[in-house]
Amino acid sequence: MSHPHDTGIQDLEAPVVLVVPADPSFVRLARLVVSSLAADLAFDFDEIEDLRIAADELVSAAIGAAEPFSPVRIQLTTGQGVLSLEASAATSTLGAELDPLAAQIVEALVASHDVSTAGGFITVKFRSHTPGSSQHLA
């Protein structure tokens, strides 16, 4: 039986890129894009919610550390059985990190995540194994 949202997408031919202002009201747009892509990749409902929450926490961290009015670039890619999110923005914050509770939440929801600041930018990332990959739900 096929997944109700299965569109046959296995790997994206090109990244999905979203650029939003450093304004917390745009976090919901990132969540929507992540949820939609995860559904197209045949993640189940609970996994989609996990990815949505992880995206919320990480994109919120990037927006929170970003310079006012600067763009936040969010890129989603797939390949080799992995869905990846990376968000980056200009920042003057050194050593940015997730709130400890947010870090625990994200750690429980995705295969790996990272928050770093270098060269005047904050970058947040997560990776999650896609349905059908050998590591999915491992």
Can you name each region flagged by the protein language model?
Residues 1-17, 61-138:
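Conserved beta-strand-loop-beta-strand hairpin that lines the nucleotide-binding pocket
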Residues 45-69:
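Conserved ATP-binding N-box helix of the HATPase_c
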Residues 1-53:
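Bergerat-fold GHKL ATPase/HATPase_c domain
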